[in-house]
Protein backbone atom coordinates (compact mmCIF):
# COMPACT_ATOMS: atom_id res chain seq x y z
CA UNK A 1 0.00 0.00 0.00
CA UNK A 2 2.88 2.37 0.73
CA UNK A 3 4.37 1.81 -2.72
CA UNK A 4 0.99 2.29 -4.38
CA UNK A 5 0.42 5.56 -2.52
CA UNK A 6 3.87 7.11 -2.99
CA UNK A 7 5.78 5.85 -6.02
CA UNK A 8 3.92 3.10 -7.88
CA UNK A 9 0.68 4.28 -9.50
CA UNK A 10 0.69 1.11 -11.60
CA UNK A 11 -0.31 -0.83 -8.45
CA UNK A 12 -3.38 1.29 -7.69
CA UNK A 13 -6.00 -0.73 -9.56
CA UNK A 14 -5.01 -4.29 -8.54
CA UNK A 15 -4.60 -3.26 -4.90
CA UNK A 16 -7.94 -1.46 -4.89
CA UNK A 17 -9.54 -4.70 -6.06
CA UNK A 18 -7.72 -6.88 -3.52
CA UNK A 19 -8.52 -4.46 -0.68
CA UNK A 20 -12.21 -5.31 -1.06
CA UNK A 21 -11.54 -8.87 0.11
CA UNK A 22 -9.25 -8.26 3.09
CA UNK A 23 -11.99 -8.73 5.69
CA UNK A 24 -12.14 -12.20 7.30
CA UNK A 25 -14.39 -14.56 5.41
CA UNK A 26 -14.40 -12.57 2.18
CA UNK A 27 -11.20 -13.75 0.53
CA UNK A 28 -11.08 -16.95 -1.46
CA UNK A 29 -8.24 -18.92 -3.10
CA UNK A 30 -8.50 -16.89 -6.30
CA UNK A 31 -7.88 -13.70 -4.32
CA UNK A 32 -4.77 -15.19 -2.75
CA UNK A 33 -3.59 -16.22 -6.22
CA UNK A 34 -4.12 -12.66 -7.45
CA UNK A 35 -2.17 -11.28 -4.49
CA UNK A 36 0.74 -13.63 -5.26
CA UNK A 37 0.64 -12.48 -8.87
CA UNK A 38 1.01 -8.87 -7.71
CA UNK A 39 4.01 -9.91 -5.60
CA UNK A 40 5.60 -11.62 -8.60
CA UNK A 41 5.03 -8.46 -10.62
CA UNK A 42 6.73 -6.44 -7.89
CA UNK A 43 9.74 -8.75 -7.92
CA UNK A 44 10.12 -8.40 -11.68
CA UNK A 45 9.72 -4.59 -11.61
CA UNK A 46 11.62 -3.73 -8.44
CA UNK A 47 13.39 -0.82 -10.14
CA UNK A 48 10.21 0.85 -11.36
CA UNK A 49 9.52 4.32 -9.97
CA UNK A 50 8.29 7.81 -10.77
CA UNK A 51 10.43 10.35 -12.58
CA UNK A 52 9.58 13.98 -11.83
CA UNK A 53 10.88 17.02 -13.66
CA UNK A 54 10.88 17.89 -17.33
CA UNK A 55 8.97 20.97 -18.41
CA UNK A 56 10.01 24.07 -16.51
CA UNK A 57 6.60 25.71 -16.81
CA UNK A 58 4.08 24.64 -14.16
CA UNK A 59 1.38 22.85 -16.14
CA UNK A 60 -1.21 20.87 -14.19
CA UNK A 61 -2.94 18.19 -16.24
CA UNK A 62 -5.49 15.67 -15.08
CA UNK A 63 -7.13 12.58 -16.53
CA UNK A 64 -10.29 10.95 -15.18
CA UNK A 65 -11.93 7.71 -16.23
CA UNK A 66 -14.55 5.21 -15.13
CA UNK A 67 -15.41 1.63 -15.97
CA UNK A 68 -19.17 1.39 -15.70
CA UNK A 69 -20.68 -1.49 -13.67
CA UNK A 70 -17.54 -3.62 -13.96
CA UNK A 71 -17.97 -5.21 -10.52
CA UNK A 72 -19.96 -8.34 -11.31
CA UNK A 73 -20.97 -8.88 -7.69
CA UNK A 74 -22.35 -5.40 -6.97
CA UNK A 75 -22.58 -3.71 -10.41
CA UNK A 76 -20.66 -0.76 -9.01
CA UNK A 77 -18.19 1.12 -11.17
CA UNK A 78 -14.42 1.52 -10.95
CA UNK A 79 -13.22 5.12 -11.00
CA UNK A 80 -9.80 6.68 -11.19
CA UNK A 81 -7.85 9.83 -11.86
CA UNK A 82 -4.29 11.04 -12.14
CA UNK A 83 -2.71 14.49 -12.12
CA UNK A 84 0.69 15.32 -13.54
CA UNK A 85 2.83 18.36 -12.84
CA UNK A 86 5.31 19.18 -15.56
CA UNK A 87 6.09 15.57 -16.49
CA UNK A 88 5.41 13.15 -13.65
CA UNK A 89 2.28 12.07 -11.83
CA UNK A 90 1.89 13.75 -8.44
CA UNK A 91 -1.56 12.49 -7.45
CA UNK A 92 -3.64 9.46 -8.40
CA UNK A 93 -6.47 7.33 -7.10
CA UNK A 94 -8.32 4.16 -7.98
CA UNK A 95 -11.55 3.39 -6.18
CA UNK A 96 -15.06 2.01 -6.53
CA UNK A 97 -18.24 4.05 -6.71
CA UNK A 98 -20.23 4.16 -3.50
CA UNK A 99 -23.47 3.24 -5.29
CA UNK A 100 -24.77 1.67 -8.48
CA UNK A 101 -24.75 4.18 -11.33
CA UNK A 102 -27.31 4.26 -14.10
CA UNK A 103 -25.13 4.87 -17.16
CA UNK A 104 -21.56 5.21 -18.36
CA UNK A 105 -22.06 8.98 -18.57
CA UNK A 106 -23.11 9.09 -14.93
CA UNK A 107 -20.08 7.00 -13.96
CA UNK A 108 -17.78 9.39 -15.84
CA UNK A 109 -19.39 12.39 -14.12
CA UNK A 110 -18.84 10.87 -10.69
CA UNK A 111 -15.21 10.13 -11.59
CA UNK A 112 -14.79 13.67 -12.92
CA UNK A 113 -16.30 15.20 -9.78
CA UNK A 114 -13.92 13.16 -7.63
CA UNK A 115 -11.01 14.38 -9.74
CA UNK A 116 -12.17 18.00 -9.51
CA UNK A 117 -11.99 17.92 -5.72
CA UNK A 118 -8.37 16.82 -5.96
CA UNK A 119 -7.65 19.40 -8.65
CA UNK A 120 -8.89 22.24 -6.46
CA UNK A 121 -6.72 21.06 -3.57
CA UNK A 122 -3.65 20.79 -5.81
CA UNK A 123 -4.29 24.29 -7.15
CA UNK A 124 -4.50 25.73 -3.63
CA UNK A 125 -1.34 23.83 -2.63
CA UNK A 126 0.63 25.18 -5.59
CA UNK A 127 -0.56 28.71 -4.79
CA UNK A 128 0.58 28.35 -1.18
CA UNK A 129 3.98 27.18 -2.44
CA UNK A 130 4.30 30.26 -4.63
CA UNK A 131 3.89 28.35 -7.92
CA UNK A 132 0.27 28.86 -9.00
CA UNK A 133 -0.66 27.43 -12.41
CA UNK A 134 -0.23 30.13 -15.05
CA UNK A 135 -3.03 28.71 -17.15
CA UNK A 136 -6.27 26.92 -16.21
CA UNK A 137 -5.65 23.25 -15.37
CA UNK A 138 -6.94 20.81 -17.95
CA UNK A 139 -8.99 17.73 -17.07
CA UNK A 140 -9.14 15.17 -19.87
CA UNK A 141 -12.04 12.71 -20.11
CA UNK A 142 -12.99 10.18 -22.77
CA UNK A 143 -16.77 10.53 -22.59
CA UNK A 144 -18.32 13.04 -25.00
CA UNK A 145 -21.73 12.81 -23.32
CA UNK A 146 -20.22 14.11 -20.09
CA UNK A 147 -18.59 17.04 -21.90
CA UNK A 148 -21.87 17.91 -23.61
CA UNK A 149 -23.75 17.75 -20.31
CA UNK A 150 -21.25 20.09 -18.64
CA UNK A 151 -21.63 22.59 -21.49
CA UNK A 152 -25.43 22.65 -21.45
CA UNK A 153 -27.37 25.00 -19.20
CA UNK A 154 -30.55 23.06 -18.53
CA UNK A 155 -31.73 20.32 -16.23
CA UNK A 156 -33.53 17.19 -17.38
CA UNK A 157 -35.40 14.62 -15.37
CA UNK A 158 -32.75 12.03 -16.25
CA UNK A 159 -29.88 14.11 -14.85
CA UNK A 160 -31.35 16.01 -11.90
CA UNK A 161 -29.93 13.53 -9.39
CA UNK A 162 -26.36 14.22 -10.55
CA UNK A 163 -26.74 17.95 -11.14
CA UNK A 164 -24.47 18.98 -8.26
CA UNK A 165 -21.69 16.86 -9.71
CA UNK A 166 -21.48 18.52 -13.09
CA UNK A 167 -22.49 21.99 -11.86
CA UNK A 168 -19.11 22.12 -10.09
CA UNK A 169 -17.30 21.51 -13.38
CA UNK A 170 -19.47 24.09 -15.12
CA UNK A 171 -18.83 26.71 -12.44
CA UNK A 172 -15.05 26.19 -12.52
CA UNK A 173 -15.07 26.54 -16.30
CA UNK A 174 -17.04 29.77 -16.12
CA UNK A 175 -14.54 31.17 -13.62
CA UNK A 176 -11.65 30.26 -15.89
CA UNK A 177 -10.25 27.84 -13.30
CA UNK A 178 -10.70 24.69 -15.37
CA UNK A 179 -10.74 23.48 -18.94
CA UNK A 180 -12.45 20.20 -19.80
CA UNK A 181 -11.17 18.45 -22.89
CA UNK A 182 -11.80 15.21 -24.72
CA UNK A 183 -9.13 12.56 -25.08
CA UNK A 184 -9.38 9.20 -26.82
CA UNK A 185 -9.63 6.19 -24.53
CA UNK A 186 -6.29 4.79 -25.70
CA UNK A 187 -4.60 8.06 -24.67
CA UNK A 188 -6.45 8.52 -21.37
CA UNK A 189 -3.81 8.03 -18.67
CA UNK A 190 -6.46 7.25 -16.05
CA UNK A 191 -7.38 4.07 -17.92
CA UNK A 192 -4.76 2.18 -15.92
CA UNK A 193 -6.72 2.96 -12.73
CA UNK A 194 -10.04 1.48 -13.88
CA UNK A 195 -9.33 -1.86 -15.52
CA UNK A 196 -6.79 -4.61 -16.06
CA UNK A 197 -4.79 -4.04 -19.23
CA UNK A 198 -2.90 -6.28 -21.61
CA UNK A 199 0.88 -6.36 -20.96
CA UNK A 200 1.70 -4.07 -23.89
CA UNK A 201 -0.95 -1.52 -22.93
CA UNK A 202 0.07 -1.71 -19.28
CA UNK A 203 3.67 -0.89 -20.14
CA UNK A 204 2.57 1.96 -22.39
CA UNK A 205 0.41 3.49 -19.66
CA UNK A 206 3.26 3.15 -17.15
CA UNK A 207 5.29 5.33 -19.51
CA UNK A 208 2.43 7.83 -19.73
CA UNK A 209 2.44 8.32 -15.94
CA UNK A 210 6.26 8.67 -16.01
CA UNK A 211 6.89 5.35 -14.28
CA UNK A 212 10.25 4.04 -15.49
CA UNK A 213 12.93 1.56 -14.50
CA UNK A 214 15.25 3.74 -12.44
CA UNK A 215 17.99 1.11 -12.47
CA UNK A 216 18.56 1.74 -16.18
CA UNK A 217 19.47 5.41 -15.78
CA UNK A 218 22.54 7.12 -14.39
CA UNK A 219 22.27 9.34 -11.29
CA UNK A 220 23.18 12.42 -13.34
CA UNK A 221 20.26 11.78 -15.66
CA UNK A 222 17.77 11.21 -12.83
CA UNK A 223 18.49 14.63 -11.32
CA UNK A 224 18.62 16.43 -14.66
CA UNK A 225 16.01 19.21 -15.14
CA UNK A 226 15.21 17.78 -18.56
CA UNK A 227 13.81 14.34 -19.24
CA UNK A 228 15.61 11.72 -21.31
CA UNK A 229 14.56 10.95 -24.83
CA UNK A 230 11.15 9.32 -25.02
CA UNK A 231 9.67 10.78 -21.84
CA UNK A 232 8.59 13.94 -23.64
CA UNK A 233 6.20 11.81 -25.68
CA UNK A 234 4.05 10.89 -22.70
CA UNK A 235 1.27 13.07 -24.09
CA UNK A 236 -0.02 12.66 -27.63
CA UNK A 237 1.09 15.42 -30.04
CA UNK A 238 -2.49 16.79 -30.13
CA UNK A 239 -2.20 17.83 -26.50
Per-range role (PLM):
Residues 8, 38, 65, 83, ...:
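Conserved hydrophobic/aromatic pocket- or pore-lining residues that grip, position, or stack substrates
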Residues 40-66, 131-133:
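Structured nucleic-acid-interacting core domains from mobile-element enzymes and related host factors
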Residues 1-47, 184, 192-194:
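C-terminal reverse transcriptase regions that engage the nucleic-acid substrate
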Residues 21, 58-59, 95-239:
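RNase H-like nuclease module associated with reverse transcription
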Residues 44-48, 69, 89-92, 121, ...:
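Conserved helix-loop functional segments at active or binding sites
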Residues 5, 9-12, 28-32, 77, ...:
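Conserved structured core elements
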Residues 62-105:
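RNase H-like nuclease fold core
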Residues 55, 86-89, 172:
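Short loop segments at secondary-structure junctions
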Amino acid sequence: MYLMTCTRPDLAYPLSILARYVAPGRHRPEHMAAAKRVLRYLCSTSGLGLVLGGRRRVVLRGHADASWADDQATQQSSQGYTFSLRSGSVSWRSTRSSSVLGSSCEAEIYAGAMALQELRWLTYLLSDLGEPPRSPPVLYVDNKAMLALCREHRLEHRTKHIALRYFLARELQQRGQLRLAYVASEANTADIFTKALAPGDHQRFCTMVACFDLLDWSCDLLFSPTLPMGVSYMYPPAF
